[in-house]
Amino acid sequence: MTDGDTKEWTFSHSLAKDATWTPGLREIFEYRDLGIKAGTKGDHVAHLIRHKGKKMTDEVQQWHVHDCTFQMVYVMNGWATFEYEGHGQKTIRKGDCINQIPGIAHREIACSDDFEVLEIVSPADFKTRIVDAPKALAAE
């Protein structure tokens, strides 16, 4: 099945033996691009994200949102605790999956040193914005 939006996509095959891990959005993590961003001409991105043992506070511990239309996180290893507007704190562990709805305010509370996830986001070049704490939490 093809249409005008996907006919320019290309087939990709990301081999584990050729994997390269690079810096990305957060200094405490390294990222492995799976070729989906290039293959879909930026419509989607899929990457593995893993903790590299660095300890530091960064903007993700602040309330923030991602300007995207889809974001899915599947935990490959370890755990992390996030707080979500309207949903409270959620700890995700190996094998867990989150459909993080567009525009939901959230923040990271903590993560394990072996935390690793598969993240798929649309569009590929989404932006992250720091926001005020949700009103219900700010009133507490």
Q: What are these model-derived regions, one by one?
A:
Residues 2-15, 107-140:
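Double-stranded beta-helix
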Residues 20-63, 69:
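A short glycine-rich, His/Asp/Glu-containing loop-to-beta-strand
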Residues 36, 51, 94, 102, ...:
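Active-site donor-binding loop signature of nucleotide-sugar glycosyltransferases
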Residues 48-51, 65-82, 120-123:
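Short, conserved beta-strand element in jelly-roll/cupin
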Residues 48-50, 96, 106:
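Hydrophobic/aromatic beta-strand elements that line small-molecule binding cavities or substrate pockets
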Residues 56, 78-83, 97:
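Short beta-strand segments in beta-sandwich/barrel cores
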Residues 85-87, 110-111:
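Conserved catalytic-core motifs of eukaryotic protein kinase domains, centered on the activation segment
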Residues 86-103:
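Short acidic-glycine-tyrosine-enriched beta hairpin
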